[in-house]
A protein has these predicted regions:
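C-terminal catalytic lobe of FAD-dependent flavoproteins
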Residues: 339-403, 424, 431, 479-550, ...
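N-terminal Rossmann-like FAD-binding beta1-loop-alpha1 element of flavoenzymes
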Residues: 118-143, 281-286, 610-637
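Active-site lid/adjacent beta-loop-alpha segment flanking the redox-cofactor pocket in flavoenzymes
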Residues: 429, 433, 437, 455-462, ...
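A Rossmann-like FAD-binding core segment of flavoenzymes
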Residues: 179-213, 286-390, 803-804, 811
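Glycine-rich FAD pyrophosphate-binding loop
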Residues: 137-155, 293-302, 630-651
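Helical element adjacent to the flavin cofactor pocket in flavoenzyme catalytic cores
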Residues: 175-192, 198, 324-338, 757-815
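Dinucleotide-binding Rossmann-like beta1-alpha1 core, especially the glycine-rich loop
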Residues: 220, 654-741, 864
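FAD-binding core/adjacent interface of flavoenzyme oxidoreductases
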Residues: 50-51, 71-120, 157, 177-268, ...
Length: 990
């Protein structure tokens, strides 16, 4: 396509590749995505529900255009150059493994290469380019990294190398301005790394930043003195029925195809949304010869208010308004209709876009009548922008919700000064990474941030503040007037229906999210229960919508209402990070910060009286409440957060019946005796989970396929023989097996494995589903749950316990159960009881969904490892690797060294895992005692019971049953002496 007619021509050779066996023509220098869309192949990735997805964001953030290239799956078509002879296919929802074993190898390495630099600029758009130039001009050494093959970002998009103009100049002033900056960058001795992914951010206690990047398939660490975050924004999702159909893309994604790669989807194309970008893209499509069905604008551009605001904007930037009027004139000449005051109500079609339903926007922001229907083949959606805040959130930058330009939505924006400084010393945020403001404002912020970063590094900076500050103020005034002209009352969720898909990655609908509000009511809990936000995009295109869906007034709260940010920022191959680490004993304990109290709006009486009050709504507390309520006991559960919000919702879901390797022998705490004494309880509780899986109201993904602990030396086999003998003496049927038996169960097992121990009673469960199911069962039996209630005072008088919470409410009960997990020590202290519980955060890692590779619970005889595959195909990797706490907010967060070591063990045991990418890591608080639970009534505190345990998810149901029996019957069928508080007194005496 000759988009600007006579001026642009191809300067690269034409090549061919195949897509699903069909020959496709392309131009060397295009991306696979551009070539596929231009050829009319709009479907790329297959979804969880069976449908297909295609090119959407065009900037590598959404992962909707994934394809399989020459057998390598998970390739982003929009970021991957086309090559002669490639064999390209749809990407399946579950990644298939290579048959070629040689592809399983990972390059051995002792550590990741570390690159030191004074100023690291992340992002090569307007803000990043100007920031890099400003910092370098002041004398600082600068490294600029960008994920794309060419610099310029979304605004200064450059022609790909496949095309050029006849006179050698850029096709238009916008592109030329970007080229000028890029040329200045090249001449300024600024190191620039393109095609470079920032995958992780780690902030150490001494405030050293470690930025994980991937370049040419190799992971590196950059250690800068200052970081300038200039990652820009993504387009805000507009969920309506049909918005996931192939052929629906963001306006920016549509523009990238056109401006950089001279291609577009087959017309007619409809451009819809809110803001001037839509007019620009529609006009550029017209000039390129693409059939444009119309422009849908939710604002009333012809209203007197809009015209007056346009006049104000013109005073600040007449050339920009002139460009906008030029776009309107182009559309008018081409007889392209502009439907102002309308929004898309639905996009219709079976497997591709066929037509679009439009509705007028009412004064209240709803979609009205009558509807209009337009036949189209592709749609560009542009309903505003949202900052890419992953890096800033990981670094601990404070954020707030700010009004999004012209719409009714508030978006998460960074708290920053005009020069980009924020609450984290050495971190600077420039341009739309901190909040939307347009390219000209981003240039000014970039210049100011670059100078401030150089000053932070100790350089004397030429005072250009006055000029750039003036430019900043000028364009802030311009943006305010411009977006006042585009002001629209349209509500963000006006077009959503029950069946509308909200999470594109996992195919989760609005109805599923709304149904999941009970017993959950925050984004993190909904994420755990529904999987919304667990896909490759990590919630970029659904978290804000989920947040609004669970709030009755469609409003957002604070940054803490979103799930805690975690690494990796974007998926990265296991093999790139796997590094062998040494082994250790024990757990790394931390002092936990006070957990945040959620703001639950409840209208409850000032005091509540019950028979039993349970403190803690994790698996142990919920199981206790369920067991008590089923026996007719009036029971209430308190939690400062939401049910399943801490360790119970953050563990890997292993059901352990045999001892882990670090719970036996010289690595074991307290010699291993307490852990061994707990094994019969674990065995019984695993069976109780099996019974509950048949009784609870939903599938908790319980599976009991057994567990294998593998060995790769004769010494490790002898260790397992001793461990298995102990387990058999306790009634656990653990048997030694050879390599042939392991290979029969696990064909992908490493050749290094010579044998192992097999326990058929082990299994797995989905903790994200299991605890909520227990909560519902408890509620159905009459238990009440009160969230947002942090316990502040516990007293005992006249045979009653009184618990006062942060709301000022008083709960009175004859008996209190301390099921507060890692905070059980705090609760005990309030009641005058010393409960020796410590917090030790542990990490978990999850990969992309894959075809079945492991059907058992897998562990290692001399390494920290647990490994299993979830029902949907994700491989979950854990095994007791330590995590830490983020600065300054105290989020539980994996450590880089633990991620590297855990991945090494996993791929060492199952080499095929090297083909998979890590989707996310997270950490949860492990309850560190001595290897055994603390159960039962405290003798000198009548009516105060402990139900506290490590390995809590395995033991949860039985702990609940035992505690309920003690309360209702005054006894348990189990010998609880090994699990009483008295054992610590005996240890002290000894």
């Amino acid at each position: 396509m000759d988009a600007l007619g006579r001026r642009i021509s191809k300067n690269a050779k034409e090549i061919t590749f195949t897509y699903e066996g069909k020959k496709v023509s392309a131009v060397e220098g295009q991306t696979l995505g551009a070539a596929l869309v231009g050829a009319g192949h709009l479907s790329q990735r297959k979804g969880r529900l069976g449908g297909t997805h295609g090119h959407y964001c065009g900037m590598g953030a959404c992962f909707e255009c994934l394809v399989t290239v020459d057998g390598r799956s998970g390739v982003r078509a929009c970021m991957t150059p086309v090559q002669q002879g490639q064999s390209v296919k749809h990407h399946p929802y579950k990644t298939a493994f290579y048959a070629d074993a040689s592809r399983h190898q990972s390059d051995p390495k002792e550590s990741l290469e570390v690159v030191a630099v004074e100023v690291l600029v992340v992002g090569g758009g307007p803000a990043g380019l100007q920031a890099a130039l400003s910092a370098r001009k002041a004398g600082a050494s600068v490294l600029l990294v960008d994920e794309r093959a060419s610099l310029g970002g979304q605004y200064f998009k450059q022609l790909s190398s496949a095309y050029s103009t006849k006179d050698g100049k850029a096709p238009d002033k916008q592109m030329q301005a970007g080229r000028t900056l890029i040329d200045e960058l090249a001449a300024a001795d600024i190191k620039q790394w393109r095609n470079t992914l920032v995958w992780g951010v780690f902030r150490e206690e001494h405030d050293q930043f470690r930025i994980g990047i991937e370049r040419d398939g190799k992971a590196l660490i950059v250690e800068p003195k200052a970081v300038i975050i200039a990652t820009g924004a993504t387009e805000r999702p507009y969920p309506v029925p049909g918005w996931t159909l192939p052929g629906v893309m963001t306006t920016g994604g549509l523009q990238t195809l056109l401006r950089s790669y001279r291609t577009a989807p087959p017309g007619p194309v409809l451009v819809a949304g809110n803001g001037p970008l839509n007019l620009q893209v529609a006009a550029e499509l017209v000039e390129a010869g693409v059939e444009v069905a119309g422009v849908v604008e939710s604002a009333k551009l012809t209203s007197l208010t809009a015209l007056a605001q346009t006049g104000k904007a013109m005073r600040h930037a007449p050339s920009l308004i002139g460009k906008g009027l030029g776009y309107m004139l182009t559309l008018k000449r081409a007889q392209v209709p502009v439907f102002d005051g309308y929004a898309i109500a639905a996009i219709e079609g079976d497997s591709a876009v066929e037509r679009v339903a439009l509705a007028p926007v009412t004064a209240e922001g709803e979609l009205g009548q009558p509807m209009r229907h337009i036949k189209v083949k592709a749609v560009g959606l542009g309903y505003g922008f949202q900052p890419q805040a992953e890096i800033s959130r990981l670094l601990g930058v404070e954020h707030h919700y700010a009004s999004d330009t012209a719409s009714a939505l508030k978006v998460l924006s960074a708290e920053r000064f005009p020069d980009g400084r924020c609450n984290v010393e050495g971190v600077f945020i420039a341009g739309e990474a901190g909040g939307f403001g347009g390219a000209q404002l981003a240039l000014a912020q970039g210049a100011l941030s670059g100078a401030a970063a150089a000053k932070h590094c100790g350089y004397n900076v030429e005072d250009t503040t006055a000029h750039w500050s003036s430019q900043q103020r000028k364009h802030q005034h311009f943006q305010k007037a411009l977006w006042s002209a585009f002001s629209s009352p349209l509500k963000p969720l006006a077009g959503i229906t029950d069946d509308t898909i909200v999470c594109r990655c996992e195919g989760i609908t609005a109805k599923e999210i709304i149904s999941g509000r009970e017993p959950c009511s925050d984004v993190a809990s909904i994420k755990r229960q529904t999987r919304a936000g667990m896909g490759r995009c990590q919630g970029r295109y659904c978290a804000a919508t989920v947040n609004m869906l669970i709030a009755s007034d469609q409003k957002t709260g604070s940054q803490f209402d979103l799930p805690a940010p975690q690494n990796p920022i974007k998926p990265i191959a296991i093999g790139a990070l796997a590094i062998e680490k040494g082994e250790w004993a024990g757990h790394r304990r931390v002092t936990m910060p006070t957990a945040r109290v959620i703001n639950e709006s409840t209208t409850l009486p000032p005091s509540i009286e019950v028979d039993v009050l349970v403190i803690g709504a994790g698996v142990a507390g919920s199981a206790t409440a369920m067991s008590l309520a089923k026996q007719g006991v009036d029971v209430a559960v308190l939690d400062r957060g939401l049910p399943n919000g801490q360790a119970s919702g953050g563990n890997a879901g292993s059901l352990h019946v045999q001892l882990l390797s670090f719970d036996f022998g010289k690595k074991a705490e307290s010699g291993g005796g307490p852990a061994a004494s707990t094994l019969p309880l674990q065995q019984a509780s695993a069976s109780l989970w099996e019974q509950l899986s048949k009784e609870l109201d939903s599938d908790i993904e319980f599976k009991r396929n057994g567990g294998i602990m593998v060995a790769e030396s004769e010494e490790q086999m002898r260790f397992l023989e001793r461990k298995a003998a102990l387990e058999r003496s306790l009634g656990i049927d653990t048997q030694m097996i050879g390599r042939a038996d392991i290979e029969h169960k696990l064909p992908a097992i490493s050749e290094a494995i010579i044998g192992g121990a097999w326990c058929g009673e082990e299994g797995k469960i989905n903790p994200l589903l299991a605890t909520p199911a227990l909560v519902r069962a408890a509620q159905q039996a009459g238990a009440r749950f009160f969230t947002g209630e942090a316990v502040q005072c516990i007293t005992y008088a006249n045979g009653k316990w009184e618990v006062t919470t942060s709301s000022g409410r008083r709960y009175r009960a004859g008996k209190v159960v301390n099921a507060a997990g890692a905070w059980a020590g705090e609760i005990g202290k309030l009641a005058g009881v010393s409960v020796p519980v410590h917090a030790a955060p542990l990490q978990m890692i999850v990969t992309e969904a894959a075809e079945p590779i492991v059907d058992v619970l897998l562990a290692h005889a001399d390494r920290h490892l647990t490994l299993k595959q979830a029902a949907n195909g994700n491989v979950i990797i854990g095994g007791g690797w330590p995590a830490g706490l983020s600065i300054p907010f105290g989020y539980q967060r994996p450590l880089l060294e633990s991620i590297e070591g855990n991945l090494w063990v996993a791929q060492h045991v199952l080499p095929a895992l090297n083909q998979l990418r890590v989707l996310r890591t997270w950490a949860a608080i492990n309850i560190n005692i001595d290897g055994a639970p603390i159960l039962g009534e405290v003798p000198h505190r009548p009516g105060f019971y402990n139900a506290v345990t490590s390995n809590g998810f395995t033991l949860g149901p039985l702990v609940g049953q035992i505690t309920a029996d003690l309360i209702t019957r005054g006894k348990s069928d189990w010998n609880l002496a090994p699990f009483s508080l008295a054992r610590f007194e005996r240890q002290g005496a000894a």
